[in-house]
């Protein structure tokens, strides 16, 4: 673990020295170290000294609990300048995103919301639901009465899966 973090730093240092700055582009250092506080702190400290345009947190959302992820985010960001962009890789559950934003994370990317949508699932203020379950087939209540969003208030739980099917079938037929 420690030797790997050290060898990765050599590569990152060379990468930083080789990178040619261009308008609209930035080079991010990726903080690694699994669930090990000492490795993540060491990695973030060394990356901060190298000085990147932003910092990404990698190696999270791979089976650890929400609490373990939050702890890892906390000690990963201890040495990172607050004025630099912070990017959390591969995290897509709302509870994780909200907790990360509270800790200063700025950017996210994840296939989870798209995958959930494709498979008839939705995130609501009451948790995740599967709109393909029989209980929602004739449920004309809004998707989420607790959210003041257009979709949440104007489309029912029964309408969303039907509309998705009607929108995707012509595309599939063309392909």
Predicted regions mapped to residue ranges:
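Single conserved hydrophobic/aromatic residue that forms the stacking wall/gate
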Residues: 1-6, 166-175
